[in-house]
C-alpha cells in the first residue's frame, strides 16, 4: 500500500484540481501515522472526510488495508476507529461492498480492551444489516465462525454478539451450523466466554424457530443457570425473561420454572439479587397463574433474604408486583401474602432496605384503597417518618402525593411536621436541599393555613443558610410558593420578611434579598414590584460592599421589564447612571450592561 503521506498527494485525494482543500486531507492522512496519539485520534475521527476525498475505490484498496494494519494502536484510537467504521458503508461504494469493512472490524473484535471489542461488535451488527443474504453467507457468517473458533477468548466473546444478527437471513443448513457454534460457546472452558454467551442467550432465542427454542435454547439456559460461576448463572436469569416470552404456559411450567425456582434460592446472593431485580419482567413474562403459584412464594423468600442487597432489590419491586397482579386479586394477595413481610422490613436493620421500601411503599395506597391504607399502611408510614435514617424520611415525604390521592394528607400532617423540621435542619446540606425541592408539593397538599403556621419560618430560615446551593434553592422555592398561593399571600406573608433582610449586617444575606426580588418580581407583578421591592433595591445601590452594588445593577436589569416607563426613567436610570461611574470595575460593567439592555442610554 502507498505510504500514508503519499495517499494525500494524488489527484484523487481531494477530488482533483490541486486546490486548497487537498492540503488538509494530506495532513489528516499524515496524522494517521503520527507519533502523537492525539493527532492520530483527531485523524481517525475525521476518517469519513479522508474517505470522501479519496473516493470509494482508493478507500477500499488503500485506506481499509492500512486501517486493518493499525490494530496495534492506543485503545482510544481503536475505539474511535471501531465507531467510525460502523457508518462507512456509503464511503466504500454502498451495500455491495459492505464486506470490505469486515477485515478491520474483525481485527478490532479480537483486541484485549473490552470497550473496543464491544464497539467493533456494535459496528459489525450495524453492517450485517447492509449485507444481502448471499453476501451475508459468503462474508459475514465465515467471519462469525472464525471469531467463534478463535484461539483467544476475546474473539470468542465477540462472536456471541453476532449470532442473532446473521441467523434470521441464513439458509437452513447455515442456521444449523450457527446454532451448533453458539451451543459450543455456552460450554466453553473460559468463564468469560460462557458469560458472553449467557448475556446473548435471550437475544438469540428471539430470532430462533420455536422448536429450536424448546430443543436447544432451554437446555442451554438450564445448563448456564447451573454453571459453576455465579457471574454466568446471574446472566442466565436475565435471559429467562426473553425465553419466557416465547413459550406457552405449559412449557413454562415444565421447561423454565424448575430452573428459575433454583435461581431464586441460589447459594450466591448475586444470583438471588438478579431474580429480585428482574422480578417485574419475570412476573409479566410468566403470567398470572405461575406468578400466584410460584413467583409470590419466591418473592416472599427474597423479601426475607439473609443478604441486605437482595432484600433491598425485592423491596424496590413491591409496588410493581402489586400493579402487575390481576386487578381482581391485587388487594387480597398484597394484604395476605406481601404486607406481613413489608411490616418486617419497615424496621429492618439495614438502612438501604428501609430506604428502598420507603421509596415505593406509598404507591401501595392506590392499590389497597382508603380503608386498608388507613388501617394497615398509615402506621407504617408514621413509623418511617420517625426513622433515624434521613433517606427513609425523605423517600416517604417525596412520595406523599400517592397517599394524598387516597386518604388526604391531613391524616399524616401531625407526624409529618417533626420529620420535615428535622430534615430541614439536617447536618447534610444535600438532605436539606432535597426537602426544599418537595416544599411546593407539600405546600399545595397541606394548604396555605397549615403552611403559614408550621412551615413558613423554615422557608425563610433556608434563605440565610450557610450553603449557597440551599440559599439559591430556597429563593426558587419562594417563587413556586407564590405561584401556588397567589400574589396577595406573597404581599402579606413573604415580601415583608424578604425585604427586612436588606438591612442584615451579613452582606450575603443582603444579597439574598436581591436574589429573592429577582425571583419574586415576575410572580408578584408590576404593582408589588414597583411599590414594595423597587425602593429597597434602589436604596441598596449605596451599599458599602461592591458585590451587593453590582447585584443591584443585575437586579434592576432583571426587574426592569416589569416596571413602567416612569419608574424606569425617573428612578432606575439615575441609580444605574451613578453605578456606571462606580470605582469598582464589576459594578461599572453590570450597571452599563443594565443601561444597555433596558435601553436607558
Curated annotation (Swiss-Prot):
Each HEAT repeat appears to consist of two alpha helices joined by a hydrophilic region, the intrarepeat loop. The repeat units may be arranged laterally to form a rod-like structure. GO terms for cellular component: cytoplasm; cytosol; extracellular exosome; membrane raft; nucleus; protein phosphatase type 2A complex. It comes from Homo sapiens. PP2A consists of a common heterodimeric core enzyme, composed of a 36 kDa catalytic subunit (subunit C) and a 65 kDa constant regulatory subunit (PR65 or subunit A), that associates with a variety of regulatory subunits. Proteins that associate with the core dimer include three families of regulatory subunits B (the R2/B/PR55/B55, R3/B''/PR72/PR130/PR59 and R5/B'/B56 families), the 48 kDa variable regulatory subunit, viral proteins, and cell signaling molecules. Interacts with IPO9. Interacts with SGO1. Interacts with RAF1. The gene is PPP2R1B. Belongs to the phosphatase 2A regulatory subunit A family. Keywords: Acetylation, Repeat. Changing residue 448 to A: In a colon adenocarcinoma. Changing residue 498 to E: In a colorectal cancer patient. It holds the Pfam family PPP2R1A-like_HEAT. Changing residue 101 to P: In a colon adenocarcinoma. The PR65 subunit of protein phosphatase 2A serves as a scaffolding molecule to coordinate the assembly of the catalytic subunit and a variable regulatory B subunit. Changing residue 504 to G: In a lung cancer patient. InterPro entries: ARM-like (IPR011989), ARM-type_fold (IPR016024), HEAT (IPR000357), HEAT_type_2 (IPR021133), PP2A/SF3B1-like_HEAT (IPR054573), PP2A_Regulatory_Subunit_A (IPR051023). The modification N-acetylalanine is found at residue 2. Signal peptide: none annotated. HEAT repeats lie at residues 20-58, 59-96, 97-135, 136-173, 174-212, 213-251, 252-290, 291-333, 334-372, 373-411, 412-450, 451-489, 490-528, 529-567, 568-601. GO terms for molecular function: protein phosphatase regulator activity. This is Serine/threonine-protein phosphatase 2A 65 kDa regulatory subunit A beta isoform. Changing residue 65 to S: In a lung cancer patient. GO terms for biological process: apoptotic process involved in morphogenesis; meiotic sister chromatid cohesion, centromeric; positive regulation of extrinsic apoptotic signaling pathway in absence of ligand; spindle assembly.
